[in-house]
Amino acid sequence: MSSKEIRLDLDRTRRINMPEAVYCEGKTTDQCLEAVKEMLTNENSSDAIIATRANEEQFSALFELGPTLAYGSTLSWRHRPAQKFTIGIVSAGTLDLRVANECKVTLEALGHTTFTITDVGVSGLHRL
């Protein structure tokens, strides 16, 4: 996949009130950088920018762009204003932490306060 094959939906926020995200898995580091840089410099949008599922090389390169929040394999820039909701993220176990962390960064980029409860698997329902 060349950088020419990446098609960002820069009008997405206007249409559905959700920002475009860069799903890094399967892309080169250069493609991820190009996509995030294009969104950062887009004059028509000041919405949150989210890059998810970055590998170590992609994460390091994207981190150089000065994200507002970087956690796990997800980075975000230009967060939305604070919302009135606090959202709980509950994961079953350590295998789910990557997805829980991705949810945390995404929700916080959208302006929500979050809290996380981990390792609440089937054998631990009493911990709810």
Where do the protein language model's features map onto the residues?
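Short, structured interface segments
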Residues: 66-80
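Beta-hairpin (beta-strand-turn-beta-strand) motif
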Residues: 54, 80, 92-94
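Residue-level preference for short coil/turn positions at secondary-structure junctions
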Residues: 44-45, 82-85
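Long amphipathic alpha-helical segments
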Residues: 1-66
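Glycine-rich phosphate/diphosphate-binding loop of Rossmann-like nucleotide-binding domains
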Residues: 84-127
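Amphipathic coiled-coil/heptad-repeat helices and related helical stalk/stem segments
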Residues: 32, 127-128
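A broad, low-specificity signal marking well-ordered, structured residues that form hydrophobic/aromatic
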Residues: 49, 75, 87
